[in-house]
Every structure is written in C-alpha cells, then in structure tokens.
Regions:
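An amphipathic alpha-helical interaction segment
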Residues: 1-9, 13-16, 20-23, 41, ...
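Basic, amphipathic alpha-helical hairpins
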Residues: 1-7, 20-34, 54, 58, ...
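Short, solvent-exposed loop/helix junctions and linker helices
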Residues: 11-15, 33, 81, 93
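Compositionally biased regions
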Residues: 13-16, 99, 128
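Pre-recognition alpha-helix immediately N-terminal to the DNA-recognition helix
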Residues: 16-24, 66, 70-73
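Basic/polar phosphate-binding segments, predominantly the helix-turn-helix DNA-binding elements
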Residues: 36-69, 88-113
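Short, basic, alpha-helical segments at the C-terminal edge of helix-turn-helix-like DNA-binding modules
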Residues: 66-75, 113-127
Length: 129
C-alpha cells in the first residue's frame, strides 16, 4: 500500500524542476549558447541548486547530460553521412578540438574512426559505441 501511495503522490518541486530542465535540454541541446547558467535562468533557480537537484535525480551532472545528448546527435549525424565537422557544429559543440577529445574519451575512438567502422559494417550502426 505504501508503494501505491508513493506512485500517486504529486511530484515534488525539485523533481518538477529537473523534469523541466531535462525537457528544455532535450529540445535545445543543439544551441551552442546553452549553458548551465542559461538553463538555471530558464528554470528560475540558481546554478548551484539546479546542479545539485539534477545530479540527485539523474545521477549525472547537467553538463554531462548535455554532452551525452550532443554526442548522440553527432553519432546519428555521422551515421547519416554528415562530415565530422558538420556533425560537431550541428550538435551544438563550439570547440572542435574539445569535441574530438570528448568523443574519443567517451567512445574510445575518433569520430573519423567511428565513421569508417560504420562504412565497413553498416548493419552495426545502432550497436556501435
């Protein structure tokens, strides 16, 4: 019975804040000017409070979540045939060198190596890193 009550309880203000932040990030992650500060302004809260609440509910930092959204977009763009630079720019990254380092750090290969893997094994597009 306690579990049933917990499921029907209205969301807390903090979880609503995080849900609003996640929805905004998902809708605007390609904006190169999107920052934790601009997200905090959008949600009418401080950067510190937003960062703490976000990490508590998602187990990930705002920056990490945004980076992952952008990387997923970039991988889809590369798989669709975009150049690495175009995929980087279309994904909201502002620094190409930083993007390359982050991609390699997350996936263990460069974006060009990823593209080459896709060309060799197109049936693995959705199962690659």
């Amino acid at each position: 019975k306690i579990v049933a009550e917990r499921r029907t309880a209205p969301p807390s203000a903090t979880s609503a804040l995080v849900a609003k932040a996640v929805a905004f990030l998902q809708a605007n992650y390609t904006d190169p000017n999107l920052t934790v500060g601009s997200l905090a302004k959008y949600t009418y809260t401080s950067r510190e409070h937003l960062s703490r609440a976000f990490k508590t509910y998602t187990m990930e930092s705002v920056h990490g979540y945004l980076t992952n959204l952008r990387m997923q977009h970039c991988r889809r763009a590369i798989a669709a045939g975009a150049s690495v630079l175009d995929a980087c720019n279309a994904s909201g990254f502002t620094n190409y060198t930083s993007f390359l380092k982050t991609f390699r750090s997350l996936y263990g290969i460069t974006p060009s190596e990823y593209r080459n893997q896709l060309r060799r094994t197109p049936e693995r597009v959705h199962s690659t890193p």
